Amino acid sequence: MKTALFLVFALAFIAVEGKMSRACSKPGQTVLAPDGCNHCRCSEKGILMACTKMMCPPRTIEKSCKPGTTFKHKDGCNTCKCSDDGKNALCTSKLCL
């Protein structure tokens, strides 16, 4: 049981590390964060390390939506709310890992 639990945590860590490392092509580089607003620094191993945590402007969508409804952003982790006229939406700007 302990071995299985260890393997689950190890695979989860590898998956997250692999996803984050794709953003860095060289150590020490500064790249745009996954939220599209903040910036992150790449570690010596080339993985995303330290990111700014500025408040980002609201994200908008490019198609109409049903007024007042909420839905998941295309990134899969942020949530959006449709405006009263159905022409815009405001979305959260969480860092998605």
Curated annotation (Swiss-Prot):
InterPro entries, alphabetically?
Pacifastin_dom (IPR008037), Pacifastin_dom_sf (IPR036201)
Q: Name one GO cellular component term.
A: extracellular region
Region of interest (Pro-Pro-Arg motif necessary for proteolytic processing), residue spans: 57-59
GO MF, one annotated term: serine-type endopeptidase inhibitor activity
What's the family?
Belongs to the protease inhibitor I19 family.
Name of this protein: U-reduvitoxin-Pr11a
- Keywords associated with the record: Disulfide bond, Protease inhibitor, Repeat, Secreted, Serine protease inhibitor, Signal
Which SUPFAM superfamilies would you find in this protein's record?
PMP inhibitors
Q: Name one Pfam family in it.
A: Pacifastin_I
Every copy of the Pacifastin domain together lies at: 22-59, 62-97
Signal sequence, renumbered to the chain? 1-20
Which cysteines form disulfides? 24-42, 37-56, 40-51, 65-82, 77-96, 80-91
What is the recorded function of this protein according to its Swiss-Prot or TrEMBL entry?
Answer: Inhibits trypsin activity and prophenoloxidase (PPO) activation, an enzyme essential for both clotting and insect innate immune responses. It does not inhibit activity of chymotrypsin and protease K, and has no effect on phenoloxidase (PO) activity.
Q: Does the keyword Repeat apply?
A: yes
Locations listed in the record? Secreted
Task: Write down the position(s) of the site called Reactive bond.
Answer: 93-94
Task: Give the highest taxon in the source lineage.
Answer: Eukaryota
